[in-house]
Amino acid sequence: MSLYRKHRPASFGDVIGQEQVVSVLEKQIKNSNINHAYLFSGSRGTGKTSVARIFARAIGTQSTDLYEIDGASNNGVDEVRELREAVQTLPFQSKYKVYIIDEVHMLSKAAFNALLKTLEEPPAYVVFVLATTEKNKLPETIISRCQNFSFKKPHESDVRELLILVAKKEEIELDKGSLALIALLAEGSYRDALTILDKVLAVSKDKRIFVHEVEKITGAPSSVLVNQFLEALVTGDKKKAIGVIKDATDSHADMRVFTKLILRSARFAMLLVLAADMREFIKNEISDEELVFLGSLGKGLEAKKLPNILRALLKAYQEISVAYIQSLPLELIVAELPT
């Protein structure tokens, strides 16, 4: 069984990073104030379906009265009409029948119209939980008939917290660098973080995972290349910087991830210059070797150097996804370095 399925939260207390959603739902259950329709929206892997299942169990719905529907593959008007007929039957064992419709934005216009009729006058024993990653694609008539909950994209610290919990349960040793890199690569998705950990664990011999293994399995650029490029930018060494970009390209590194890692390191270097008390915070984010490197990088620099580099990197990061040549935005940064 995959780590994500094995460690899916089983109760509200297990949910990480969605305290505002959990708090409201728990109060509604305590006060027996259950709505007939809920809309859970947010980016992928943030726990929408997991919380929907927990909510269903918390209001006493047995498995025989819980229905999960994939909106992507059941998006026609006929399927929704069948659903409308099904909701008319009483629950088998529970007070409520709960219908979880995932990726609800994939329904057709005709299907939405059919669903709307059910949402307008649902039986008292039916609860709908609609989940979507693209709320903007839903008709306003659907949104207005649901109680809306926005699932926030978790911070890297939230993702790291989950990874630490799972690693402890599975008796996995994760070094600080691998923990930080997996959290960054997951891009705010708990599911993606555990999927990456699963993938790395599959080739690990003794459940000890180091950052170089994560780099190798995921194709992430090495920290050596990241540090070399950042150092070249700071010192104005154009030849070295172009050489590092070539090395990253030759190793088939994802230039978007490469730039993101450089951005993170440049930001930490700037924070170390601006506020010495940030050192403790940064120490928990990166390896001791990186901390020493970034601390020395900012020494003696003019005040605007690192902020200017960060602005250029941010611009490059935004341009990479639309660039015909992925390395070009970084190459332009190098070309525009003062001589």
Residue ranges of model-derived segments:
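P-loop/Walker A NTP-binding region and its immediately flanking N-terminal helices
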Residues: 1-148, 154-158, 164-166, 246, ...
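Extended, largely alpha-helical regulatory/partner-binding modules appended to the mid-to-C-terminal parts
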Residues: 46, 52, 58, 79-82, ...
